[in-house]
Amino acid sequence: MSNSENTGRIPLWLVLTIIGLAAIALLALFFYGSYSGLGSSL
């Protein structure tokens, strides 16, 4: 058990969760922007 590996570092599952949420948020923003923009123009 080497504690020096995890000291001062963010856990991998937390990083993956944040990256996943950010990717979903970006996709949602792109879809919402294209939908509202194209929908209102049409």
UniProtKB/Swiss-Prot annotation:
Membrane topology according to the record: Single-pass membrane protein
Give the UniProt family note.
Belongs to the PsbJ family.
Provide the gene name from the record.
psbJ
Q: Which residues cross the membrane?
A: 10-30
UniProt function note: This protein is a component of the reaction center of photosystem II.
Question: Superkingdom of this entry's organism?
Answer: Eukaryota
Coiled-coil positions? none
Q: Where in the cell is it found?
A: Plastid, Chloroplast thylakoid membrane
GO BP terms: photosynthesis
Assembly: PSII is composed of 1 copy each of membrane proteins PsbA, PsbB, PsbC, PsbD, PsbE, PsbF, PsbH, PsbI, PsbJ, PsbK, PsbL, PsbM, PsbT, PsbY, PsbZ, Psb30/Ycf12, at least 3 peripheral proteins of the oxygen-evolving complex and a large number of cofactors. It forms dimeric complexes.
- Gene Ontology cellular-component terms listed: chloroplast thylakoid membrane; photosystem II reaction center
Protein keywords? Chloroplast, Membrane, Photosynthesis, Photosystem II, Plastid, Reaction center, Thylakoid, Transmembrane, Transmembrane helix
In which broad location class does this protein mainly occur, judging by the first location in its UniProt entry? plastid
Name the chain's protein. Answer: Photosystem II reaction center protein J
